[in-house]
UniProtKB/Swiss-Prot annotation:
Record's keyword annotation contains Protein biosynthesis: no
Assembly, per entry: Homodimer.
Domain of life: Bacteria
Principal location: cytoplasm
Keywords, sorted A to Z: Amino-acid biosynthesis, Branched-chain amino acid biosynthesis, Cytoplasm, Leucine biosynthesis, Manganese, Metal-binding, Transferase
Cofactor(s) of this protein: Mn(2+)
Keyword Cytoplasm included in the entry's annotation: yes
Species assigned in the record: Synechococcus sp. (strain WH7803)
GO biological process, one term: L-leucine biosynthetic process
Function of the molecule: Catalyzes the condensation of the acetyl group of acetyl-CoA with 3-methyl-2-oxobutanoate (2-ketoisovalerate) to form 3-carboxy-3-hydroxy-4-methylpentanoate (2-isopropylmalate).
Binding residues for Mn(2+): 17, 208, 210, 244
Gene Ontology CC: one annotated term: cytoplasm
Name of protein: 2-isopropylmalate synthase
Length: 540
């Protein structure tokens, strides 16, 4: 049987696979903020990125290893294709972390071997032990993944896994890369590996999966029943295409249904010992942080963290909940950290109160960033009576969004009405602090603003999404705008919040433009789609 650590290890890949969501690119400070919150959440492993992809990715993984990795903290992991260049870059990036891991992979399905790698099974069987052994010579903790395991021939899969373990892999990850399998099939796949790989007792079995058919969480729970003890997941389930298995859903399923899962761990059914090391009261805070920084809105009916997850509209349900919450709620909202504000903030609140509340929300700002955030807070407090946590999150997420921005929005003015041609004038500051102004007309005030900004920036792009939502309730609520721009097949997101939605739209557009410029200057490799160095030689 596979090695059993006695509980489920949570491997968070929000910063790697989650960031591969279209338009969800994060800068260094945003990645660091999320990594710090993941450590507070109590995940076992943080996959901080793909270091070989670009200098920016390398630096982000290295900074996270330096500032988040610790003797008592999470393992800091980097992804590497099965090639020496990738693996060496990964080892160098995670080196500052006392607890570090290299996660290397190669495809094992015939369709990937034929059309992507152009390798035979024999060639892959030669590459795997060589590259795993090389990784093991650089770090003590190596994870190996069989990409597209769900569509791989079982006998070949068993042989690859056995070779990887013999070469030094201590974790074997089984990905359902395209979200194709059903729970019964995935459970049988894990059980087959557990039964047919002779040295599987030397490694922890891990699973990774995508939600293309909406089955990722169900597949993972079935895998746990069949011996998987590490789950690779993301906050809010973000990720490529339909996303990854959602961390919050997996953790809470194991928490709420502990009596059901305990026997699969050799425990008494009523054992109170948690099945994961996650601090569930940090879940809501982490979800909001990731949503704010990526600009990816959580759907209202999303399990555990959606706005409606604990809302009751039916009169019968409301009556039952008022009498006893257990009548219609299987999860106490407080268990996932959904509580009322403990500090009421307003125009008379001081810097210390704001800093304390931001720290509770998971933001550890530098002195300079705190000064800027406090100035924004005071400005908002002059227009809004009560400042909520969501308002603070909106302020700070915008603050950390563009630390090295090419453009800064200085002024936006619009003129519009039922009998007026919508006109906008905008002023930008460039990197040298020089002001540039432009005016434009459009079909509406936001269109006019975007046209003026495009004229100033001169960066070709296509606006593919504009959305606005209320951050909180009330007529004085802030409006949060998300904008996505597309260029050369890539999406770049920007978001901003203001009590004036036109101003918020202008700032969001500028933030998206800055990401577009940064992305053009620092292109990155995709770990699965881009050609790998091993295509040239199996010994690289």
């Amino acid at each position: 049987m596979a090695h059993d650590p006695g509980r489920v290890l949570i491997f968070d890949t929000t910063l790697r696979d989650g960031e591969q969501s279209p338009g969800a690119s994060l800068n260094l400070e945003e990645k660091l903020a999320i990594a710090q919150q993941l450590a507070r959440l109590g995940v076992d492993v943080i996959e901080a990125g793909f270091p070989f992809a670009s200098p920016g990715d390398f630096n982000a993984v290295q900074r996270i290893a330096q500032q988040v990795g610790g003797e008592q903290g999470p393992i800091i992991c980097g992804l590497a294709r099965a090639s020496r260049g990738d693996i060496k870059a990964c080892a160098d990036a995670v080196a500052p972390a006392p607890r570090r891991r290299i996660h290397t992979f190669i495809a094992t399905s015939d369709i990937h071997l034929e059309h992507k790698l152009r390798k035979s099974r024999q060639e892959v069987l030669a590459i795997v032990p060589e590259m795993v052994a090389y990784a093991r010579s650089l770090v003590d903790d190596v994870e190996f993944s069989c990409e597209d395991a769900g569509r791989s021939d079982p006998e070949f899969l068993y042989a690859v896994i056995e070779a990887a373990i013999n070469a030094g892999a201590s974790t074997i990850n089984i990905p359902d890369t395209v979200g194709y399998t059903t729970p019964a099939e995935f459970g049988a796949l894990i059980a087959g590996i557990d039964q047919h790989v002779p040295n599987i007792s030397e490694a922890v079995l891990s699973v990774h999966g995508h939600n293309d058919l909406g089955l990722a969480v169900a597949n993972f729970l079935e895998a746990v029943k069949n011996g998987a003890r590490q789950l690779e997941c993301t906050i809010n389930g973000i990720g490529e295409r339909a996303g990854n298995a959602a961390l919050e859903e997996l953790v809470m399923a194991l928490h709420v249904r502990r009596r059901y899962f305990n026997p699969f761990f050799g425990r008494a059914e009523d054992s109170p010992t948690p099945l994961t090391g996650v601090r569930t009261e940090e879940i809501t805070k982490t979800s909001r942080l990731v949503s704010n920084l990526t600009g990816m809105v959580v759907q209202p009916n999303k399990a555990i963290v959606g706005a409606n997850a604990f809302a009751h509209e039916s009169g019968i349900h409301q009556d039952g909940v008022l009498k006893n919450r257990l009548t219609y709620e299987i999860v106490d909202a407080r268990t996932v950290g959904l509580t009322d504000n403990r500090i009421s903030l307003g125009k008379l609140s001081g810097r210390s109160a704001v800093r304390a509340r931001l720290e509770e929300l998971g933001y550890d700002l530098s002195r300079e960033d705190l000064d800027d955030a406090f100035a924004r807070f005071k400005e908002l407090a002059d227009r809004k009576r009560d400042i909520t946590d969501r308002d603070l999150e909106a302020i700070v997420s915008e603050q950390v969004q563009q630390p090295d921005a090419r453009y800064q929005l200085k002024l936006v003015q619009v003129s519009c009405g039922s009998s007026l041609q919508p006109t906008a004038t905008v002023t930008l500051l460039d990197e040298e602090g020089q002001e540039q102004s432009e005016a434009a007309i459009g079909t509406g005030p936001v269109d006019a603003v975007c046209r003026a900004l495009n004229a100033l920036a001169g960066e070709p792009n296509e606006l593919v999404e504009f959305s606005v939502k209320s951050v909180t309730e009330g007529i004085d609520a802030m409006g949060e705008v998300t904008i996505r721009l597309r260029r050369d097949g890539q999406l770049f997101s920007g978001h901003a919040a203001d009590t004036d939605v036109v101003v918020a739209a202008a700032q969001a557009f500028v933030n998206a433009l800055n990401r577009l410029v940064a992305g053009s200057l620092n292109p990155t490799l995709h770990p699965q789609r881009d050609a790998t160095p091993l295509d040239a030689s199996p010994t690289l």
